[in-house]
């Protein structure tokens, strides 16, 4: 008789899960070894050491509509570079780089926010667009910097040529033009500036220091002559004396410039608070948009009222006031674009009475704020006819308070400010690299030329414009 089984003996024992064996066999899907977490997933093949077969044609490295292609086509087939080529002569030694190569590199760099010669040197080595534009040649930073310095005036002339291409592309209307200015830092510290009053004090101090060193040097010379004989060269000036004489010379030069400027303005002498900077004497201390005092230049733009915001003229001054810039900007706009704009608008910084009189004589429909807070006040539109005895400022004040005047002036802000925002924020241009008003003016035109290139490229119309050109 079989033995009876207990309840425990009758229970079914489930199969236990078997551990997944680890393996280092390649994954069929990826060809990669399993690496623990995530190893069961499939990824695209990745091998940094894989040999690539790149096209030997550098032109195939860039997409069809790339900015680099626009710049290459523009430099090769449109721009007149005769001024640049005329400066080269047949000399012995290694031949220089092709000017088109360096020009393309500069234009692409400035249009991409790369301004310094050292960064441009690295870009020519590392960035595909720059290697395409330079045909895979790598000029050093000294060559790039010297090319920019040597041909700065010729580069300025290219601004007008690029503007003409923008006109042919239909990006310019020249109906309403807005003027505006901004303060951009000079390549100099405001702490290197000194007032005229302080210069007079320091001049006396340095004169005493120099005289003391000269007397000490003379005494040493006499003592050494008695001991060693009169066989010294006599040009072994102490380092402290050389430094003091150098500072005294620079101080006198800056002081003389202030005095000359005062005489040209019909004044006997400069005010004690007037300053000069020793690093860049032509720059001035100005108040920027953040209400901070900076060593800067006053940079001006004339912007066309279209969705493309093309810059028609770009100038630089070293006076904080915008008033002296209005007429030069108007003339430059007419020269660059080939005609005078129908209408202009500007803020209160340009409202000098002589400016308003000239604009009226030229028949230009101008809308210029007369008071700084004029358009922040809620005032009713004027009624009735204006008095015959009203002066230019009163007439302009009344004109800009009309319904049409308010609309035009409100439009000004949306026309003039975007280029400054793109140049400062988009390109990152906030300080000049060069020094001196002439060089800074050239650098500003190069920056705005590059800005217009970006507008031309972004419009998508550059191919047809280059074909017409």
Which residues does each PLM region occupy?
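Generic detector of low-complexity/intrinsically disordered segments
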Residues: 18, 54-55, 60, 64, ...
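Basic, short loop/linker segments at the boundary and entry of helix-turn-helix/winged-helix-like folds
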Residues: 62-107, 112
């Amino acid at each position: 008789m079989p033995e009876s089984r207990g309840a425990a003996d009758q229970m079914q024992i489930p199969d236990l899960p078997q551990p997944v064996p680890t393996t280092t066999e390649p994954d069929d899907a990826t060809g990669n070894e399993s690496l623990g977490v995530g190893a069961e997933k499939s990824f695209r093949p990745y091998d940094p050491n894989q040999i690539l077969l790149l096209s030997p044609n550098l032109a195939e490295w860039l997409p069809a509509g790339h900015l680099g292609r626009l710049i290459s086509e523009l430099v090769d087939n449109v721009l007149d570079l005769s001024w640049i080529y005329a400066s080269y002569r047949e000399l012995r030694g290694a031949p220089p780089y092709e000017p088109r190569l360096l020009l393309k590199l500069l234009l692409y760099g400035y249009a991409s926010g790369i301004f310094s010669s050292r960064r441009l040197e690295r870009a020519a080595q590392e960035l595909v667009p720059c290697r395409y534009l330079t045909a895979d040649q790598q000029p050093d930073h000294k060559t790039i910097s010297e090319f920019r310095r040597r041909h700065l005036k010729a580069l300025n002339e290219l601004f007008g040529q690029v503007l003409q291409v923008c006109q042919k592309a239909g990006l310019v209307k020249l109906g309403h033009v807005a003027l505006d200015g901004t303060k951009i830092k000079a390549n100099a510290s405001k702490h290197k500036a000194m007032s005229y009053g302080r210069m007079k004090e320091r001049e006396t101090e340095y004169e005493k220091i120099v005289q003391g060193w000269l007397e000490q040097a003379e005494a040493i010379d006499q003592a050494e002559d008695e001991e060693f004989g009169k066989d010294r060269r006599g040009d072994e000036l102490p380092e402290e004396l050389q430094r003091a004489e150098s500072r005294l010379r620079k101080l006198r030069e800056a002081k003389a410039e202030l005095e000359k400027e005062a005489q040209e303005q019909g004044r006997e002498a400069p005010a004690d608070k007037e300053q000069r900077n020793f690093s860049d004497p032509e720059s001035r201390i100005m108040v920027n948009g953040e209400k901070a005092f900076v060593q800067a230049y006053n940079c001006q733009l004339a912007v066309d009222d279209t969705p493309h915001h093309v810059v028609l003229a770009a100038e630089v001054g070293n006076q904080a006031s915008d008033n002296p810039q209005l007429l030069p900007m108007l003339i430059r706009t007419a020269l660059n674009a080939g005609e005078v704009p129908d209408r202009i608008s500007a803020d209160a910084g340009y409202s000098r009475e002589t400016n308003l009189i000239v604009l009226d004589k030229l028949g230009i429909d101008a809308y210029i704020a007369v008071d700084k807070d004029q358009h922040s006040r809620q005032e009713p539109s004027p009624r009735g006819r204006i008095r015959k005895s009203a002066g230019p400022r009163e007439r302009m004040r009344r004109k800009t308070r009309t319904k049409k005047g308010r609309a035009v002036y409100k439009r000004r802000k949306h026309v003039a400010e975007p280029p400054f925002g793109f140049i400062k924020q988009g390109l990152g241009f906030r300080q000049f690299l060069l020094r001196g008003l002439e060089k800074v003016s050239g650098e500003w035109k190069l920056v705005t030329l590059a800005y217009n290139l970006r507008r031309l490229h972004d419009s998508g119309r550059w191919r047809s414009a280059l074909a017409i050109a």
